[in-house]
A protein has these predicted regions:
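Adenine-nucleotide phosphate-binding core of ATP-dependent small-molecule kinases
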Residues: 231, 235-284
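Short beta-strand-loop/turn "lid" adjacent to the catalytic site in phosphate-handling enzymes
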Residues: 45-89, 106-109, 115-127
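Short glycine-aspartate micro-motif
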Residues: 2-5, 52-54, 109, 169-173
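Glycine-rich phosphate-binding loops at beta-strand->alpha-helix junctions
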Residues: 287-310
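Conserved phosphate-binding/catalytic loops in two-lobed NTP-binding clefts
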Residues: 307-321
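Glycine-rich phosphate-binding loop of actin/hexokinase-like ATP-binding domains
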Residues: 119-218
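Phosphate/pyrophosphate-binding loops at sites that engage ATP/ADP/AMP, CoA/4′-phosphopantetheine
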Residues: 40-51, 158-163, 276-288
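Short glycine-rich, Thr/Ser-proximal phosphate-binding strand/loop in the N-terminal lobe
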Residues: 3-36, 194
Length: 321
């Protein structure tokens, strides 16, 4: 079965056609062109034939713990979660809408980033907030990048020749959005993102975890609206807020050339990353491997492994395709 995979993310739109053996028949990046019309998708696919369309969807809430055939009702449920992932859910919905219009006679399947984390232990998924918040409004740690974390853990186990069931792995998804997962025996037991993709590590334009009182204080002190605070934390913070650029490669380059702001951004990012890896390791009570998923992951790995403790070995870098 040939499947067209559409990944409409917060900063990119990518297409892949997979054959029956999961080999990539073709790959297209539509980040520049966008998906303003169904025709754009049809033209991108060209003469290629496929039997189904798979969609990456960031937030599945409590409704989806696995893939789901997309119906009108499912699409409405996905739309209802947009407030919890404003940078991502709208992009996913646009991709779903355009693809269903372009290929109305094919099955469309939503694969949720939150699904991999849906059975995390209660100690990891539960926030210490009022019971009503948790029961009535579903406030909990959902976690994200689940498709990436699941793949990275599975593929790395294959590469090092060990059974996934026997491994404790910290997977590091380091893109514009960044998160870690503690994967023990193939199961997510902890992760850094939470109710939304804003929690956790320092990211390209997102703040990551901060004192929850900061937004309230800024609303009171600076007179900012809720929307202005959210915009600042989602789009004007992270590396961009510290160094004036959201590109980690540029940050590292500037820092190496003596740029003070870039050096601070690098150090704050690395501090949060090291602390996150330590937390994930503690959640599993040990670790066998750390896996980085990012084009510049080797740069990050070298910085992290330079401070490894006793008994921790560094293996030669191997690319996870």
């Amino acid at each position: 079965m040939r499947i067209l995979v559409l990944n409409a993310g917060s900063s990119s739109i990518k297409l892949r056609l997979l054959d029956a053996n999961d080999a990539v028949a073709f790959s297209r990046d539509l980040s520049t062109e966008g998906l303003k019309t169904p025709r754009a998708l049809v033209e991108a696919v060209g003469e290629s034939e496929f039997e189904a369309v798979g969609h990456r969807v960031v937030h599945g809430g409590t409704s989806f713990s696995g893939p789901a055939i997309i119906t009108g009702q499912v699409q409405e449920k996905i739309a209802s979660l947009e407030e919890l992932a404003p940078l991502h859910q709208a992009a996913s919905l646009e991709g779903i809408t355009r693809a269903r219009q372009a290929f109305p006679n094919l099955p469309h399947v939503a694969c949720f980033d939150t699904a991999f984390h849906s059975d995390m232990p209660a100690a990891a998924s539960t926030y210490a907030v009022p019971l009503q918040w948790r029961e009535r409004f579903g406030v909990r740690r959902y976690g994200f990048h689940g498709l990436s974390h699941a793949y990275a853990s599975r593929r790395s186990a294959e590469m090092i020749g060990r059974s996934l069931d026997s491994l404790r792995i910290v997977t590091c998804h380091l893109g514009a959005g960044a998160s870690l997962a503690a994967v023990a025996g193939g199961r997510s037991v902890d992760t850094t993102m939470g109710l939304t993709p804003l929690e956790g590590l320092v990211m390209a334009t997102r703040s990551g975890s901060i004192d929850p009182s900061v937004p309230l204080w800024m609303q009171s002190r600076a007179g900012l609206t809720r929307a202005e605070v959210q915009e600042a934390l989602e789009r004007d913070s992270g590396l961009a807020g510290l160094a004036g650029t959201a590109d980690m490669r540029e940050v590292l380059k500037r820092a190496a050339n003596g740029d003070v702001g870039a050096a601070l951004a690098r150090d704050v990012y690395m501090h949060a990353l090291r602390a996150g890896i330590a937390r994930m390791t503690a959640s599993m009570r040990g670790i066998e491997a750390v896996v980085y998923r990012w084009g510049g992951g080797a740069l990050i790995r070298d910085s992290i492994s330079g401070r490894r403790g006793p008994g921790v070995s560094r293996y030669p870098a191997r690319r996870v395709p």
